[in-house]
From Swiss-Prot:
Pfam families: NadA. GO terms for biological process: 'de novo' NAD biosynthetic process from L-aspartate. This is Quinolinate synthase. It catalyses: iminosuccinate + dihydroxyacetone phosphate = quinolinate + phosphate + 2 H2O + H(+). Catalyzes the condensation of iminoaspartate with dihydroxyacetone phosphate to form quinolinate. PANTHER family: QUINOLINATE SYNTHASE, CHLOROPLASTIC (PTHR30573:SF0), QUINOLINATE SYNTHETASE A (PTHR30573). Its EC number is 2.5.1.72. InterPro entries: NadA (IPR003473), NadA_sf (IPR036094), Quinolinate_synth_type2 (IPR023066). Coiled coil: none annotated. Pathway: Cofactor biosynthesis; NAD(+) biosynthesis; quinolinate from iminoaspartate: step 1/1. The keyword Metal-binding applies.
Length: 359
């Protein structure tokens, strides 16, 4: 008797086809500052004229013009974090915001292509939430000190050490770390996320200062990890007190990635969007934003009459994103962001739990 094996052989995984192969490469356009380019970008220059001298705009405008034309041709949308420079934030971005805003808005875009003007974990988050879309980051080396402070293996060891304790992971982490966590958080919703969990003890990783600051707002026991943002950890309480002494009446608005001693000196603390809304609503006569200094420039045009004191701590990773690199990304469809399918579903679940959390 002959036995037939009717089981089908497993189909081989589909061959990877690069974004450049899928969408094609476009030849670099002429980047001359022509009268037509000047006219078509004039309204955008009005938004950044306080930060870019008129004689320098001739170098920016051709890139702005080309990017805005190409993103329509490519059916692409540009997402930019609040720490991007004003030329990107005001002149080419379609959606701007903090990490939570960008994560939520990434799920609503109709475009085929997402250009993520931020650091790599943000692009990964957009890819997790849009697995069928093409996500590009203009510079794949745009990293993050927080993201690099912890690995998925570290989280597994923490789970062994603290069995049954839920893990809340800051979005400033790799997909591999997110895959080992229960739910993600951002600086704008970390307290709501922690309070949503039934456990009296919560692991809040990897930002030690964010965890310490939320511990002051909850009755839960917060376990921490020693990760720090290289921008925010440089601020000190003594520095801010010196600013207060030198500028009577100044309001200090801080980010919760700063040390709790720094936050104690602040008049308000919140996510980058929370900080922006505070300044827009309160309209203080003079204000100091304790965060990456490009953000003050980005909102200065919208709050005329507010004097910004700028202790300039720049994020070297955010500053890797530039107009020439964005243009190159659109022309050559690089750098494409991919997430290992073995971890993507678990990482996506942690992000979706955060995005869907009612606040």
């Amino acid at each position: 008797m002959t036995t037939l094996d009717l089981r089908k052989e497993a189909a081989p995984p589909p061959a990877f086809v690069s974004a450049a192969a899928r969408f094609g490469v476009i030849e670099k356009p002429d980047l001359a500052f022509t009268p037509a380019v000047a006219r078509e970008t004039e309204h955008l220059y009005e938004k950044v004229k306080d930060f870019i001298p008129a004689f320098e705009w001739a170098a920016y405008a051709p890139y702005v013009h080309a990017i805005n034309r190409l993103k329509k041709e490519r059916n692409a949308v540009i997402l930019a974090h609040n720490y991007q420079t004003p030329d990107i934030f005001h002149c080419v971005a379609d959606i701007v915001g903090d990490s939570l805003q960008l994560a939520r808005d990434a799920t609503k875009v109709d475009a085929e292509i997402i250009i993520q003007c931020g650091v790599h974990f943000m692009a990964e988050t957009s890819k997790l939430l849009n697995p069928e879309k093409t996500v590009l980051i203009p510079d794949a080396k745009a990293g993050c000190s927080l993201s690099e402070s912890i690995t998925g293996a570290d989280v597994r060891l923490l789970r062994e050490r603290y069995p049954g304790v839920p893990v809340v992971t800051y979005v400033n982490t790799s997909a591999g770390v997110k895959a080992e966590t229960d739910i993600c958080c951002t600086s704008s919703n970390v307290l709501a996320v922690v309070e949503s969990l039934e456990s009296d003890t919560v692991l809040c990783i990897p930002d030690e200062y964010l965890a310490m600051n939320v511990a002051r707002q909850t009755n839960k026991k917060i376990l921490t990890w020693k990760g720090h943002c290289e921008v925010h950890e440089r601020f000190t309480a003594a520095e801010l007190l010196a600013y207060k002494e030198a500028n009577p009446g100044i309001e200090i608005v801080g980010h919760p990635e700063c040390h709790p001693d720094v936050i104690a000196v602040c008049d308000f603390s919140g996510s980058t969007s929370g900080m922006i809304n505070y300044v827009k609503d309160k309209r203080p006569q003079r204000v100091l934003l304790v965060t990456e200094c490009s953000m003050a420039s980005n909102i200065q045009a919208e709050v005329k009459g507010v004097d910004f004191v700028k202790p300039c701590n720049l994020c070297p990773h955010m500053k890797r994103i530039t107009l020439p690199k964005i243009l190159d990304s659109l022309l050559n469809m690089t750098e494409e962001v991919l997430v290992d399918p073995a971890i993507a579903d678990r990482a996506r679940l942690a992000v979706e739990r955060m995005v869907n959390l009612k606040q």
